[in-house]
Amino acid sequence: PNDLTNFKTTGISRVEKELRLKLENIKTEYIETINHYNWNKLVYSSEYAFEPVIGNTYYLYRRSNGTHILSMISPDEWYLEYIATVKLSVEKQFELQSIGATSEAELFGNPNGV
């Protein structure tokens, strides 16, 4: 009878390592997807009086009353609290380009705790 202890130990160790990596990748993708959804929900629910154009860059601000406004005016040209810069993709999704001093956790809570 062959001693298969080394084969079994090495095999299960390799499986655990690969599955742990796969789960970490799934978790990272899940968090990124939730954040992407939250940003789009925030931008689409903000106030704006124009139809955003695919490929253009826009700026999200927060008023003192807590409401959000989407604008074509850059942060160095306006007085409102700058939240983020977004760009509208061909899928009509707002892609986050940069974020101001307000963190995602402040805006949406902590998705890592999900």
Regions found by a protein language model. Name each.
Residues K17, K27, I31:
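Anionic-ligand-binding alpha/beta catalytic cores of soluble enzymes and soluble regulatory domains
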Residues Y30-S46:
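Phosphate-interacting basic helix/loop segments used at nucleotide- and nucleic-acid interfaces
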Residues N35, L42, R63-G66, G113:
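Short linear sequence elements within intrinsically disordered, low-complexity coil regions
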Residues S45-F108:
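Domain-scale macromolecular recognition modules
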